[in-house]
Amino acid sequence: MLDALTFDAGSTLTPDYMLMLDSRDITGNISDRLMSMTLTDNRGFEADQLDIELNDADGQVGLPVRGAVLTVYIGWKGFALVCKGKFTVDEVEHRGAPDVVTIRARSADFRGTLNSRREGSWHDTTLGAIVKAIATRNRLEASVAPSLAGIKIPHIDQSQESDAKFLTRLAERNGGEVSVKMGKLLFLKAGQGVTASGKKIPQVTITRSDGDRHHFAIADRGAYTGVTAKWLHTKDPKPQKQKVKLKRKKKEKHLRALEHPKAKPVRQKKAPKVPEAREGEYMAGEADNVFALTTVYATKAQAMRAAQAKWDKLQRGVAEFSISLATGRADIYTETPVKVSGFKRVIDEQDWTITKVTHFLNNSGFTTSLELEVRLSDVEYETEDDE
């Protein structure tokens, strides 16, 4: 958005916003009192958060009712404002002196049904069907990534567990990310740079001149080298055991400076066709320093998905990068793929995914801070069965 804007040389960009309370525009009521507005766009089921600080030196600011809905738009004067969603007020603070009112609102109403404990079981269904059913009973619209929607779920229990926690557990097992944004329950493929409908998110390019601060760190090389998951089922009465290893297939690009020494590509090897074992263990990576998932899964397929999801998460965390943009970018969201330039080669050559966006706005400025992780592009796997 902003990198495509043109404005007169020497002109000054002025931050702008619009705030609506239950569909009523209250921008004019607070414009002279606004001290700061902070909007945090989080990945996953950590709700997006809106913090507004208002000057109440004269004691005339009315405290909003918890449960009220705020809709916020931010950007720059002279350009179209970007809607950042609806937020439910769940905290109000008053402090002094000088007196200040802080209003805190979140994208999902965690005082509502999403956070209520439930009992239930799901049989012979799919991941997409479960997500849609939960969305419906929470008055949300479901949007599930096609690659996840068709995953078969033979049986799973929801015992004294909120829908929020249950969905998070499903996401962790199947390599997804779940969140609530703009009245939609989103179930995405984690770190792939695609929307819930499967469309690719346009890549954003950020140069060093766009920011005024950055931080880069490579994780400990002695971290986990693999993940194991166990399964146990009774379809085959034979007391067979099977151990399955997961390794990455070779791909054209993989930044060696960020590549774990135990995550190197290997030659493709076809596994012999054998009946699925009644019980077994599945390993992603190498056995030197293994993270063992404690859950025992019902099938080999479930164990494989869980191990792959955890292994991918560990690989995405091999490096971290953050940057503060001096000129705010209201058009940037989490899961957006990013290429950067002007930094060290090891940073510039890596593909990145945004995991957190923080917009800070007041009457004199608008900045955006980004947190990014390594993007796993077009990752494919091969398996080896050890009898």
Swiss-Prot record:
GO terms for cellular component: virus tail, baseplate. InterPro entries: Phage_Baseplate_Hub. The keyword Phosphoprotein does not apply. Induction: Expressed in the late phase of the viral replicative cycle. Residues 240-254, 263-272 have a biased composition (Basic residues). Residues 233-275 are annotated as: Disordered. Keywords: Late protein, Viral baseplate protein, Viral tail protein, Virion. Pfam families: Phage_GPD (PF05954). It comes from the Viruses. It is found in: Virion. Its main location: virion. Putative baseplate hub protein. Homotrimer. Belongs to the P2likevirus baseplate hub protein family. This is Probable baseplate hub protein. It comes from Escherichia phage P2 (Bacteriophage P2). The gene is D.
